[in-house]
Amino acid sequence: MTQSPSLAAAAPIVVIPARMASTRLPGKPLADIHGVPMIVQVWRRAMEAGIGPVLVAAAEDEIAQAVRAAGGNAVLTDPDLPSGSDRVWQAVERFDPAGRHAVVVNVQGDLPTLDPGLIIRAVETVLAEPDIALSTLICEITREEERTNPNVVKAVVGLAEGQTRGRALYFSRATVPHGPGPHYHHIGLYAYRRTTLGAFVSLPPGVLERREKLEQLRALENHMRIEAALVDTVPLGVDTAEDLERARALLG
């Protein structure tokens, strides 16, 4: 893609945190998808966005080796870090100690069918206004069962007719807001200003974050503006063996 001046100046970097420990699908990053480890499939999708370097933040050496064998960049991180955000931050600080990359995109390592355009959208959104600290993505819920499913995180964003982005006011596993109108499925892909990410990981978990078990609430509890961009697709997250089969079919 041809980068705008503001995008080029921000020098975005995409970081994909990955670790072998997974309750429902152990060894998930190295799960085979048509002869390619899943983490490499995710790395390829991120490279296709064309916004800057893509770095895998690996908790274990076997993940880093798989990425490097495919021609990618990987940084080995502390396996005992408390969250993916901490892993992303440690990897960026080790890879780019000079601070050249001013925007950091956190892409989950279990999205092998990710549309690269979603990464571009997140970066464009965080750069849209100077007081946006980080951006994320939302998609309107159309399946009724998702509204009440606590595993589908809802974003509270007051979008007027025709608006394609807005300030996120809250995130919850509950069906919010009440009353007639759309509900939005939160997609856990983030573009941070680098200073925001550094501040975020230095803060303790908040009361609401611990209650909802949603890390992004730490940002809201500390008055960071999260801008949510509306997109029309939710990427498939691979959490189970059944999800893995779906991903293989989609990439077949």
UniProtKB/Swiss-Prot annotation:
Does the keyword field hold Metal-binding?
no
- Pfam families assigned to the protein according to its UniProt record, in alphabetical order: CTP_transf_3 (PF02348)
Q: What is its main location?
A: cytoplasm
Q: Which pathway is this protein assigned to?
A: Nucleotide-sugar biosynthesis; CMP-3-deoxy-D-manno-octulosonate biosynthesis; CMP-3-deoxy-D-manno-octulosonate from 3-deoxy-D-manno-octulosonate and CTP: step 1/1; Bacterial outer membrane biogenesis; lipopolysaccharide biosynthesis
Q: Pull one GO CC term from this UniProt entry.
A: cytosol
Q: Name the EC number(s).
A: 2.7.7.38
Query: Which keywords does the record carry?
Result: Cytoplasm, Lipopolysaccharide biosynthesis, Nucleotidyltransferase, Transferase
Gene Ontology molecular functions: 3-deoxy-manno-octulosonate cytidylyltransferase activity
What reaction gets catalysed by this protein? Answer: 3-deoxy-alpha-D-manno-oct-2-ulosonate + CTP = CMP-3-deoxy-beta-D-manno-octulosonate + diphosphate
Tell me which domain of life the UniProt entry assigns to the organism this sequence originates from: Bacteria
Protein family per UniProt: Belongs to the KdsB family.
Job of this protein: Activates KDO (a required 8-carbon sugar) for incorporation into bacterial lipopolysaccharide in Gram-negative bacteria.
Per its record, how is this protein called by name? Answer: 3-deoxy-manno-octulosonate cytidylyltransferase
The organism encoding this protein is: Rhodospirillum rubrum (strain ATCC 11170 / ATH 1.1.1 / DSM 467 / LMG 4362 / NCIMB 8255 / S1)
